[in-house]
A protein has these predicted regions:
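Preference for bulky hydrophobic residues occupying beta-strand positions
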Residues: 7-9, 59, 75, 89
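HotDog/MaoC-like acyl-thioester-processing domains
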Residues: 3, 66-67, 78-130
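Hydrophobic beta-strand-centered segment that forms part of the acyl-chain substrate-binding groove
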Residues: 36-72, 76-84, 98-100, 106
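Hot-dog-fold acyl-thioester-processing enzymes
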Residues: 1-55, 110-130
Length: 130
């Protein structure tokens, strides 16, 4: 089994309905991506001449996560392009699927956040993420 990132739902993550507020799931996905990259690239990937940005993201929701639930996020690369890659992020609480995020990321030069220029995804990143 691949990488799994676990996040305990905080009170502040929930809306008036008592469930995780929709945009918070994107924060969970972002945190899982950061942790996944840090684990497979063994440290600060920005110091390894790699950075990335979200080009597109969507979530198909299935069921709610609530305060104190532990959300498990399991990423997998589903497509490689020259300077981009797609990731599917499975989200669950226990055996219950709560949703699936689909994201397109672009590889950029570290430090070019104002006017990012897409650059080829480094081979070490491709190898590490599979």
């Amino acid at each position: 089994m691949g990488f799994t990132h676990r996040i305990r739902v905080r009170y502040a993550d929930c809306d008036m309905q008592g469930v995780v507020f929709n945009p918070v799931y994107f924060t969970y996905v972002d945190d899982a991506m950061d942790q996944w990259l840090a684990s497979v690239l063994e440290g600060d990937y920005l110091q390894q001449d790699f950075d990335y940005m979200v080009k597109k993201a969507s979530i198909e929701w299935d069921s709610p996560a609530r305060h104190r639930d532990v959300v498990e996020l399991r990423p997998e690369v589903t497509r490689w392009g020259r300077s981009s890659f797609d990731v599917r992020m499975h989200m669950s609480v226990g055996d219950r699927t709560i949703g699936v995020a689909e994201c397109v990321f672009i590889s950029i030069k570290p430090g070019e956040h104002e006017t990012p220029t897409p650059v080829p995804v480094p081979e070490k990143v491709r190898a590490a993420l599979g």
